[in-house]
Swiss-Prot record:
PROSITE patterns: SSRP (PS01317)
The name this protein goes by in its record: SsrA-binding protein
Compartments, record wording: Cytoplasm
CDD domains, sorted: SmpB
HAMAP family hit by this protein: SmpB (MF_00023)
Disulfide bonds: none
Chief location: cytoplasm
Entry GO MF terms: RNA binding
A family per Pfam: SmpB
Function statement: Required for rescue of stalled ribosomes mediated by trans-translation. Binds to transfer-messenger RNA (tmRNA), required for stable association of tmRNA with ribosomes. tmRNA and SmpB together mimic tRNA shape, replacing the anticodon stem-loop with SmpB. tmRNA is encoded by the ssrA gene; the 2 termini fold to resemble tRNA(Ala) and it encodes a 'tag peptide', a short internal open reading frame. During trans-translation Ala-aminoacylated tmRNA acts like a tRNA, entering the A-site of stalled ribosomes, displacing the stalled mRNA.
Compositionally biased spans, kind Basic and acidic residues: 135-158
Amino acid sequence: MAKKPKAVKDSNNQVVATNRKARHNYSILDTYEAGIALMGTEVKSLREGQASLADAFATVDDGEIWLRNLHIPEYHHGTWTNHAPRRNRKLLMHRREIDNLVGKIRDGNLTLVPLSLYFTGGKVKVELALARGKQAHDKRQDMARRDAQREVTRELGRRVKGMTS
C-alpha cells in the first residue's frame, strides 16, 4: 500500500524564500515537496535568510530534476570553498515521483516552478508546483475576481458594523 503524501506546509517550517510571482504568472495544478542537494556554505547562507526564487525554474535532464536560476548569495564568512551563487542544484525525489512528473509535463504542456524554499527538521526543502502558464487575459480575470471578492468582504464588514452600532 502506498504512503499518503505529507502535507507540504507544517507549522515548524522556517520559510527562507517564496516565489510570489509564480502564483501570478502560473495556474498551480499540483504541488510537491523535494529535497535539494546543497554545499555547506549554501546552507549557511540560507540560514541567514538569503535566497531568491525570482527567476528559478526546474528542468528534467536524464531522469533527474535540476533547479536552475536559484540565487543563493555567497556566504560572507566563506573562503575559497564558497559556492557559485547561480549554479544548478539537483532536487531529490523518488524515482516514481520523477517519472510521474515527466509524464505530466510531456502530456500537458506544463512546467515545474519552485514556490518556496524552507527548512524542515534541519533539512532544506523546495515546494515545487506543476503549473501551466497564464496568458494576459487570465491574469486580468484573476485580478478582477480578487477585487470583487475584496469589495464583497468590505461591504459585509460595513453591514455587520452598522448592525452592531
